[in-house]
């Protein structure tokens, strides 16, 4: 989405990513190469920013949740049937009603972390409600709204809730959404959130925007590298 210039902060020329990303660019680069949150070009398109990959983590990965094991077993046999979870963001009673309709026809359901920065129940509570309603829950978690301590707490709570997987996204900048008054965090990004989800025994997934510049496979490669089992 291209942001009208009037809604952007008139900052100094861009010399660092507004999302504090290391493994950029994100999927929000506009078709003309400009940053989603700044009129200047994305810094990852202007120059190579070499990234040193850390050594593979040696921390033992705990056993997956029961729902994650079930999803892995399904994937070993056939294609997974997954759908979105169209419940209102702050209405707990919607969850059981939607689950009653979807559960007989789908293997899992994705409840995303709002890209538009609207207020909604936190990921772990959504995961708890969906699991209690009989759904295999795949829960979106963005790095925009929480620092790494809060994110690690959410992942621990998601494991405790028994969700199947975590959809890890960096998140759209708050300048582009419904709450431009909210300060973005971006202490982590999708690429650094993925291994943390995996380390909690959760199946991780990520989003990719193939139409966003620079039209290369680097984002896909980097996300896959961090999300797969060692």
Segments the model singles out, each with a brief description of its role:
Residues 4-5, 81, 109, 130, ...:
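Generic signal for short, ordered secondary-structure residues
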Residues 100, 106-108, 112-115, 131-132:
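Catalytic alpha/beta active-site cores
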Residues 110-111, 138-141, 230:
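Short catalytic-loop micro-motif centered on adjacent basic/acidic residues
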Residues 131, 135-151, 157:
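Structural motif corresponding to the early beta-alpha repeats
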């Amino acid at each position: 989405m291209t942001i009208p210039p009037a809604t952007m902060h008139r900052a100094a020329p861009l010399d660092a990513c507004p999302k504090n990303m290391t493994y950029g660019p994100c999927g929000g680069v506009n078709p003309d190469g400009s940053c989603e949150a700044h009129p200047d070009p994305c810094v990852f398109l202007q120059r190579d920013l070499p990234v040193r990959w850390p050594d593979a983590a040696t921390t033992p990965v705990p056993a997956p949740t029961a729902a994650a094991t079930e999803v892995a077993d399904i994937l070993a046999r056939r294609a997974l049937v997954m759908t979105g979870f169209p419940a209102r963001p702050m209405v707990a009673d919607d969850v059981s009603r939607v689950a009653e309709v979807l559960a007989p026809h789908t293997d899992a359901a994705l409840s995303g972390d709002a890209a538009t920065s609207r207020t909604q129940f936190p990921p772990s509570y959504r995961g708890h409600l969906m699991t209690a309603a009989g759904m295999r829950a795949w829960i979106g978690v963005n790095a925009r709204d929480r620092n790494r301590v809060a994110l690690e707490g959410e992942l621990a709570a998601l494991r405790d809730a028994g969700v199947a997987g975590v959809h890890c996204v960096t998140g759209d900048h708050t300048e582009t959404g419904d709450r431009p008054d909210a300060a973005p965090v971006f202490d982590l990004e999708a690429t650094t959130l993925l291994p943390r989800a995996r380390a909690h025994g959760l199946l991780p997934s990520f989003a990719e925007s193939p139409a966003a510049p620079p039209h290369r496979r680097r984002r896909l490669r980097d996300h896959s590298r961090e999300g797969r089992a060692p």
